[in-house]
Amino acid sequence: QSAHDTFWDFVGLHTEATHHTFWNMSDRGIPQSLRTMEGFGIHTFRMINDAGETTLVKFHFKPRLGVHSQVWEEAQITGGVDPDFHRRDLADAIEAGAYPQWDLGVQVFPDTKEEMFEGIDLLDPTKLVPEELAPVEIIGTLTLNKNPGNYFEETEQVAFHPGHLVPGIDVTNDPLLQARLFSYLDTQISRLGGPNFSQLPINRPHSPVNDNLRDGMYQQAAHTGIAPYKPNSLDAGNPTETPIDKGAFIDVPRPVEGHVTRRSPASFEDHFSQARMFYLSLTETEKQHLIEAFSFELGKCYEEAIKLRYLDVLAHVDQELAETVADNLGLPHPEQQEVPDASPSPALSQLGKTWPIDGRRVAILIDSDQELD
């Protein structure tokens, strides 16, 4: 729930959130189903081949059913009458054999010293790379073909973490990703009762683990070694790390130069161009839905100063948009602002595409007063 002063005070003062807020207020914020949601990480990762060559990538999951949303009135009714709709819809589809599927794809970028692509900082999590500039290359398919047998054990206890990576995928210096590498681990230790959450069946790797972790809450292994450190001469040097020729992952060395500061680079200071790109990419219907969402949410705020501040944010993206929302709120138009240059990305619109009917419920409406032949 974001229709309150706290949220709009925050995003109005943290304008780097503008692009994200436009996505939230758009039709994508009220998906028709979990089966019709796109999945993509906001971070850039580094892929490494056997020769030690690196490439930067962004991961995408494209739903086979396409990307679809509810309309506002439908979302209000569904949320009030059937708030568990999304989870039940997903479970029902799996149970019926209409297995939800997503195509896994990657956007691939050269791993340059600047870590930029077409003027876009690949380490800035508030920005995306338009698919027209870097097409998504499909490399696999994700299929959900089984419901949990025990929801608590198999879902509630899952410990997701961006640092859980397979050999060949490494992190970048995206500052938000680096923060998440710490915070996710810290959260799982708190949420799942201690440092041994990785021993829970749903989190346990297929291969046995032999490491130096000992004791702690909910420890399930009976360790008998007396030297949980390395190197040691008491346990024959065990445990030892897996060598490279046995599949161990090794970080690729990278040169570093410059000054270490607590400031973001200048490329991070562009807070509005991608929000404008997103807005220009929408159809007129989608734009109208976005305007109505901004008007509804800001209309629930009590502090007029917060509303006026965010109208100024909108003016940095599109003056007509800002003035329309201001009219809906009964507030004066914000001052004209300089808006950034931006071109639409057709891939960001949900409309204008055709998709299969598989796994959908179909309703047939019949008017008894009309001749059907």
Where are the language model's segments positioned?
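Active-site-adjacent core segments of small-molecule enzymes
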Residues: 1-372
